[in-house]
């Protein structure tokens, strides 16, 4: 098996790492950065940009630039309606599920995420110099079963075998603790990212990493902090100028970028100026937005969001059956954990300064790479056992609309449990197994993650049939459910994946489309390179003709001019095959002319540097080295 890469698929940014040379290495992307914006831009002619190039064009292309797609993964439209309405791009409701509408083409959240994963895959392949097919992908600890399944589907669409889905705080703890030897520690991982918040309590020592509890909120993160600044700016501008910027997608995209920048700056300074010239116009008169935001104002605006981090921390400590004094270290993960008020909240609750020993943007990917090395049994990683938990209670709906629990929250996974149920009415020959996830007592108050029917039950009085329901949750936190009638032996199984909305056939179709798009992207890049090569060759040839026209043999000049025109025509038509042929033709006639020029007249030898190095021929040997030198390097880059 080749390398298993670790990918932190984040709401705002993503990161990829690999275990190499007995240590995890964070891989820089093609732009030279160690994290990649989780942004996909769709530009003219179906071309796609991912990462920084997509983010750079977002202001001028807001309706076709997708960000924060992670917030829609594995969710129904109703569950993500608030986020959908806040986005400048169009999110529609298709059969109860969110879809991103880009000029009539409807993309699932998994497809958009797969485009980001393809970028991370390519980044790793460029670094390793070999194809990558296997990955460990991280998810928020509080992700539901359907959100985990959707993440796995995104990996499959991107052409990756997802070897393991790992909780982000667990990955961070693994990265933090892997070099701590046999030291026994209890740590809290406080992970406040771009779109989600997790808190996990772990104990490790002797190579065993055990998650004691986890809690969180999948709708709390840096995006929400951005939104309070955006609302403050938009409301202020409306009050001052009477113009509603929320109706203008381009203006909202500018506000989004300005809010994010201001939030980041306020982590290191006490005030920042937000200056957005020409944000709007009225009666042909341009309007500018200039505001100063202090850290105190920002903390007041974000007070409720900051306080919302506290209850999950309290619940996690309670579920772990510990007190805050039992915690040896608090690890901060996620870009939003840099907010000073958040750090103050963590310090006050846990009674200790949080550790600054890890990079909050990279530590999750590093942990995922270590998990990949563990699965791959690579040398240098040591004997490590990782015991994670399921974040939410799993159960089924029973008579009266009650949720009956089978697997409690914070149960170590993998885990399997069976319970026996019976029928509710006489002569009932079928039962519906409705699978739920959540902590509320009634079925309707929890998240439905799938259902199936068990038919062919032997008719009998109510309460007589014995239906054995088995929940089997794997190491990825993904659930398999089966129901069996003990009398007839009839059995029905389901792998909980329906709530993601994608069938195996749809995943395969999307995977094929992703591969086609990758090939198309490669072809487009090669086309651009070829056009640039032709453009450079045209420019160089024209300059050479201008400077050396009187030295070129008369019988050769028409051939050069004809070949040059052929290349110009091919370049104008953007025909790659024609450009190749024209370049070869131009090289050929230039070499013939060069050979005659070198023969000279009356025994004189022209300078050898007047040749066309790299254009298909070799530099001529010998010749004068006089002062009257004309350089015309003619390169064909392949």
From Swiss-Prot:
Q: What does this protein do?
A: Acts as a chaperone.
Q: Where is the composition biased (Gly residues)?
A: 613-625
Q: What is this protein called?
A: Chaperone protein DnaK
InterPro entries in UniProt: ATPase_NBD, Chaperone_DnaK, Heat_shock_70_CS, HSP70_C_sf, HSP70_peptide-bd_sf, Hsp_70_fam
* UniProt keywords, alphabetically: ATP-binding, Chaperone, Nucleotide-binding, Phosphoprotein, Stress response
Location of Phosphothreonine modifications: 196
HAMAP family cross-referenced by the UniProt entry: DnaK (MF_00332)
What's a Pfam family this protein contains? Answer: HSP70
